[in-house]
Amino acid sequence: MCTDYEGPKPEQKAEIERKLRQEITGFVPRARIRPTDCAPIVVPEEDAYVCREMRWGWQVPWDKAPLVNAKSETLTTLPTFKPHLDQRCLILSRSFKEGGAQFHQPDWTVFCLAGLWRDEPSGSRFVMLTTTPNESVAPFHARMPFVLRTEQYADWLRGDFFKILTTPDKSPLEKFQPQPELF
């Protein structure tokens, strides 16, 4: 269960726009993001992509804690998610944590995680899709966020997402190794 990730830095806006192949409006960078925090989320709006500030976690009647993750394998069958399958979003990320380890792309480039969003009385909220882990994450946790390949972004937001659900990006990620303090 992913409950901690790092959003892009302000200077990475151009990188995000290059990967999305268009300008985005409304980008507000966030550093460390945890459940109930607000985060920049990319959604389609008319002929463009916009960044909207959304809170992480859906309120659900059976639990006081918000629902923050959704298993990609059961997404299309569970009544919690089925009504929102057309409300797909991109979660902007530089890294995520699983099992106490932090994972990132080479050179700390921005990548997108698959998500769903919905409007609630308290405002717009999102959940993060998860999948089986790749070889980098498997020693640390049984699940990981659903990482999208750059060429999947447009289809995830507006196209054939069923095929994407069966082909998560299993490319290896790098594990962040903090340097020990010398003094």
Predicted feature locations:
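Short linear sequence motif anchored by a di-proline
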Residues: 1-183
